[in-house]
């Protein structure tokens, strides 16, 4: 533990002045340094310059990629002439456009930033950054403003048309001085957006008229014609847009605009995009989303095996890229959505074990408060939902009960989701005959219901009191009790639920309770309770069909199963349930007929799954083999499909942390190997002169002992030299539990990629490294990660996983 004397404001000012004077001296002695990085130098000399870790070029550059781009294999060979002064800048522009076509916006922006680093005056590079931020208008505005500024020199007329068209599309910032505009005029905003979109379409047509050989303009116009519906500009003819795309494919049959044709026909006529579905992935095999998109078409056409192949290909390409570039999974566009849809398709085709494995894998991925928690549409939420779905729809009650004590379906702070899980746990306990434990779980749900009902009564009393007070004169001053009541909301971390919210919660819980009571009635053969509770439980139709058959309502169950087969054709589960119920009813000929269909549908299914294993007598009766599945006949419309293992690994794996060595305040070398064999948190901070960094240390230091109790070491590495580190410690006024180390030459920052390659400056970083030296969690940003409690909880979760 380090204890130091108080750090006075005067000392802080002197340190800041010393640093500024040192910088001025360095710049005076080395004019070339100033010339090489004018924005950086100007910002550092300006007292109003950016905080440590922030971009020298403005706030728009803070978010997004900060590490250098490389030329990636598997990008479509785009031709897009620009004013680039170097071949490298031109290559990165063309790579960026290929990535735009694949909606790979993070990497597209990285490519365009690399082009700008190669050629700082290249206006079209900032146009590309704008295009890569189509869904982030504040950042897009900053980039297009820069492009407009640079377009005045060394820019061709064609490039200028691209830039000016996009400038008119991106909304200008509103005037904050208008105090009278209390509420935005939504209708006026919609109309303005529509007009800007119509003007952009007109501008792109003008560009095409002047440069008719510009294939990329055709592709981007086709995309915008499809996107324009979101801005109120309707597509009057999809076939006209399709014809425009046809001109692109005439010039380049493997153009990545196959992606746009899939979007064009996805919801309208998916069969019109089968050819593009076959060519989309091979047109840009290094972009995961290009493998994902054909899955839309195949899913709509109920070709679930083909869709699952596409989604697995997408996942593998993403996994390979993440491991190669050290990104965390949910930083990747569309990653979680692709994988959760893959689980749904695996359920459809009966690949139950793969569905379970992938769901658990999604849950196991690193959580982050910005993009992967229960409240975000990330891997954790999707994984939990799909794991429960797979277990319940395939009636894997024993496995579901095992999860109650496992690492994947742990208790959650979200009441409604915890109740959903407890409800299914009670169902599983009843279905497996553990009536005692099931009743205990049911009572816990009933207690929750009583608490909610009491809350409703309290809120109704509160509303009545408020209504009564409104009728009274307000001449009487508020008493102390009323003042205390008014202060209560400030003491709460989140607002109390409203009466309507609590009532909706009760409705959801009542549905869960009805589901549990229905399961209890099935096992007790209590038909009266079953008939009363079943409609309230809103069960999945196939679960309901099986429960009805078990309680004796076989005919009703068969009707539900027949409807499910009709509504969900080409899916394994409806057919399996129908065959089972028909066989139990004695309708063996009908069962055999549907079984013959199931043999083809279940060509990739897990036959050891209980739902399918119970059909062995039917298979024997029709003379089928033990493995009664029939192979899927080869299709001629799938295009060239590479072996899946060539695209990447099936699962994301954490990467190996770099080796490192830093100096302690006494100048001794501390090697990273000293932490081998035990988990550790490494914090990269930007010195005592960085106020945000000190705030981070403030957050983590009080929890140092809690981390140690969890078996996790914590160490912080600074950009300061040993001398600067000691001076900071001397002037700092509080105890610091966390060992602080010096990395004055910043090579460790670069090794861990806590470095802005574009502006040559360090970034904030926080890492969890396990006992094997694998990086299990990370945050690299222009701001430090300050939620020490979240990371402690998440570290415990991740380290407990197998």
Where are these regions (language model features)?
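Short active-site neighborhood of thiol/selenol oxidoreductases, capturing the structured segment around
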Residues: 671-700
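Thiol-/selenol-based redox modules, centered on thioredoxin-like
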Residues: 762-802
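Bacterial N-terminal signal peptides
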Residues: 17-32
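Structural microenvironment flanking redox-active thiols in thiol-disulfide oxidoreductases
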Residues: 694-734, 746-750
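Alpha-helical adaptor scaffolds
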Residues: 222-226, 231, 238, 256-268, ...
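N-proximal helix/coil linker or "cap" segments that precede and/or mark the start of modular domains
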Residues: 604-659, 673-676
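N-terminal alpha-helical interaction modules that lie
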Residues: 37-261, 270, 282-284, 301-313, ...
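Residue register of alpha-helical TPR repeats
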Residues: 90, 124, 159, 164, ...
């Amino acid at each position: 533990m380090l204890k130091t004397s108080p750090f006075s404001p005067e000392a802080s000012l002197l340190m800041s002045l010393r640093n500024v004077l040192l910088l001025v001296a360095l710049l005076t002695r080395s004019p070339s340094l100033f010339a090489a990085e004018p924005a950086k130098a100007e910002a550092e000399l300006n007292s109003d310059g950016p905080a440590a870790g922030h971009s020298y070029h403005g706030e728009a550059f803070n978010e997004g990629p900060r590490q250098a781009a490389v030329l990636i294999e598997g990008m479509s060979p785009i031709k897009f002439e620009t004013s680039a002064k170097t071949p490298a800048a031109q290559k990165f522009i063309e790579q960026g456009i290929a990535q735009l076509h694949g909606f790979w916006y993070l990497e597209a922006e990285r490519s365009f930033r690399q082009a700008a680093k190669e050629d700082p005056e290249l206006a079209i590079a900032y146009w590309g950054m704008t295009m890569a931020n189509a869904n982030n208008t504040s950042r897009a505005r900053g980039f297009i403003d820069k492009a407009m500024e640079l377009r005045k020199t060394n820019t061709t007329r064609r490039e200028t048309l691209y830039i000016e068209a996009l400038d008119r599309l991106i909304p200008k910032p509103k005037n904050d001085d208008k105090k009278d505009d209390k509420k935005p005029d939504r209708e006026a905003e919609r109309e303005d957006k529509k007009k800007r979109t119509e003007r952009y379409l007109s501008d792109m047509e003008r560009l095409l008229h002047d440069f008719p050989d510009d294939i990329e303009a055709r592709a981007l116009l086709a995309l915008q014609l499809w996107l324009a519906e979101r801005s109120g500009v309707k597509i009057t003819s999809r076939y006209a847009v399709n014809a425009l795309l046809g001109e692109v494919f005439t010039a380049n049959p493997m153009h990545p605009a196959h992606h746009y044709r899939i979007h064009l026909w996805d919801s309208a006529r998916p069969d019109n995009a089968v050819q593009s579905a076959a060519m989309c992935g091979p047109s840009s095999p290094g972009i995961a989303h290009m493998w994902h998109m054909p899955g839309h078409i195949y899913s709509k056409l109920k070709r679930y095996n083909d869709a699952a192949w596409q989604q697995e290909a997408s996942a593998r390409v993403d996994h390979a890229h993440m491991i190669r570039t050290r990104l965390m999974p949910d930083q990747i566009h569309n990653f979680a959505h692709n994988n959760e849809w893959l689980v749904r398709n695996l359920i459809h085709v009966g690949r139950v074990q793969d569905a379970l494995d992938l769901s658990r894998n999604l849950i196991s991925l690193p959580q982050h408060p910005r993009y992967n928690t229960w409240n975000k549409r990330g891997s954790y939420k999707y994984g939990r939902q799909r794991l429960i779905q797979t277990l319940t729809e395939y009636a894997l009650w024993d496995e579901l009960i095992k999860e109650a004590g496992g690492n994947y379906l742990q208790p959650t702070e979200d009441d409604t989701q915890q109740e959903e899980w407890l409800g299914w746990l009670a169902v599983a306990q009843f279905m497996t005959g553990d009536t005692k434990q099931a009743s205990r779980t049911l009572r816990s749900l009933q207690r929750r219901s009583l608490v909610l009902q009491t809350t409703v009564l309290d809120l109704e009393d509160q509303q009545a009191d408020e209504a009564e007070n409104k009728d009274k004169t307000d001449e009487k001053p508020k008493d102390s009790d009323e003042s205390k009541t008014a202060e209560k909301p400030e003491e709460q971390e989140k607002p109390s639920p409203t009466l309507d919210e609590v009532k909706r919660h009760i409705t959801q819980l009542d549905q869960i309770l009805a589901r549990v009571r229905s399961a209890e009635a099935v096992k007790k053969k209590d038909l009266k309770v079953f008939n009363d509770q079943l409609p309230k439980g809103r069960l999945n139709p196939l679960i309901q069909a099986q429960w009805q058959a078990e309680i004796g309502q076989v005919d009703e169950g068969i009707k539900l199963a027949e409807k499910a087969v009709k509504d969900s054709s080409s899916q394994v589960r409806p057919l399996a349930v129908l065959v089972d119920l028909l066989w139990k009813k004695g309708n063996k000929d009908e069962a055999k007929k549907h079984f013959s269909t199931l043999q083809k549908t279940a060509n990739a299914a897990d036959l050891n799954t209980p739902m399918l294993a119970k059909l062995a007598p039917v298979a024997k009766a029709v003379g089928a083999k033990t493995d009664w599945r029939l192979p899927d006949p080869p299709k001629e419309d799938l295009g060239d499909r590479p072996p899946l293992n060539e695209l990447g690994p099936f699962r994301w794996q954490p990467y190996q942390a770099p080796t490192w060595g830093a100096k302690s305040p006494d100048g001794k070398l501390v090697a990273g190997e000293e932490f081998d064999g035990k988990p550790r948190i490494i914090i990269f901070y930007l010195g005592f002169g960085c106020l945000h960094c000190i705030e981070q240390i403030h957050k983590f230091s009080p929890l140092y002992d809690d981390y140690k109790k969890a078996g996790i070491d914590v160490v912080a590495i600074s950009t300061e030299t040993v001398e600067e580190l000691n001076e900071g410690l001397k002037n700092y006024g509080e105890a610091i539990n966390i060992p602080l180390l010096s990395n004055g030459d910043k090579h460790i920052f670069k090794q861990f990629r806590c470095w802005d390659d574009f502006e040559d400056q360090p970034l904030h970083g926080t890492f969890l490294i396990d006992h094997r030296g694998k990086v299990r969690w990370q945050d690299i940003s222009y701001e430090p990660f300050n939620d020490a409690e979240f990371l402690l909880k998440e570290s415990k979760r991740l380290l407990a996983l197998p």
